[in-house]
Amino acid sequence: MVQRKLGGKHMNNQKKSFLEKVSDFVVDRLAGPMAKFGNIPAVAAVKDGLVAIVPIVIIGSLFLLIAMLGLPGTFSEDPLIPVLSSVSSRFLIFYNMTMNFLSLYAAIAIGMSYAKRFEIDSINAALLSIAAFFLININDLSNGMSVTNFAAGGLFAAIISSLISIRLYRFFLERKITIRMPDGVPANVTNAFVALIPFFVIFTLLWVVRSILNFDITSFLNTVLGPVFSGTDSIFVFIPRVLIGLLLWAVGMHGDNMIGPIFEPLKLQWVAENAKALSNGVDIKQLPHIWTTVVERITIWPAAAWGILFWMWKSKLKQARTMAGIATPAAIFTIVEPVIFGLPIVLNPFFIIPFILSGTIAAIVTYSAFSLHLINRVFVELPWATPPFISGYVATGGDWKGVLMVVINFAIGVVVYYPFWKAYEKSEKQKESNQENEQTADSSVSV
């Protein structure tokens, strides 16, 4: 027993390798806090709610793209598709009903998502969220109802109004400050009467804030937080985001899921603001924002994942070629788990450095290219699994340089991985040679 304890103590005191130390640091100092942040009910509700409205954003973006193809002065002096000229305005109506009501849809989705975590009736949650959003944004109906804040500019007000209203509703439910119905009353009727007192108090509170005190929450948030959020769309934030995301992947964490809750609301607002600016006649190379989900997708994985797949296909190692055949179809659609965990790249001393380095260099090059107005800026949101060479073309309004950027990032990955792959290949061949020698020696001994 003593020996076993001493042995365990001896094992615990063994010096950890550099990779183990890096892994422990990332897990303890980065992944742990990020996971805790992402699991906060309000944060998770915002993330899930914004994911829920992505189909609306994608469809609205595509209708804007179709409309722009029929309008002069967008991509060229003349319409790219003249036959669309007569119906472009009709496509813009569809765009306006989707993207220009983005915050309204977000308020409903986030409220329902937050309520689900507290097992609150979803219909009441949706009604409460949409009413709260109306109450904080509408103060004067004399000249009709202004929907300016319903677009991307009201997104953060929508998030806050939904979270606060649902939280207050939960407060009333937990303390049973509701109208109680007798047993046997249908559930839908019970839910309607249960909501009466909480709704009245919450609505009155929001009405007092907006109409009596004349405090515009949306304008206040945009004034205070707007410069901060706009400043986040910077190469000095984009590069650390890419680097930290790849570092998390390299130690076995899902980097995108860990960082996503921090940046998803911003990226959604930025692509919506780009779309609105384009529809208002702003030059496509001068749109206000660079950083979008599409920009991430055409940047990171063509370098960090496709680069190593190139050498896997050309390798003399049979297992590498086999893994390349398995991983490539998924990697084309930026589903990179097979190559990251299958090769593996995770905690592999040969590949951690080029994996992080290639993606980071690609991020610097890509962001710089957009900053210098060499490529049309992105105004379309696309499904996350869209192949980068397609999204690079479509999301930039048919700019071939968006595809070229994907090719350049792929080339960056190929070049960065080359010496590391050769070292890995040499090591694997040496292992195979040693195994063959051992098998030969064992055969000789047995004879």
Where are these regions (language model features)?
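Transmembrane alpha-helical segments and their short flanking loops
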Residues: N12-F37, S76, I81, S85, ...
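Early transmembrane hairpin of solute transport permeases
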Residues: A35-K176, V346
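Generic multipass alpha-helical transmembrane bundles of integral membrane proteins
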Residues: F200-K318, A324-A327
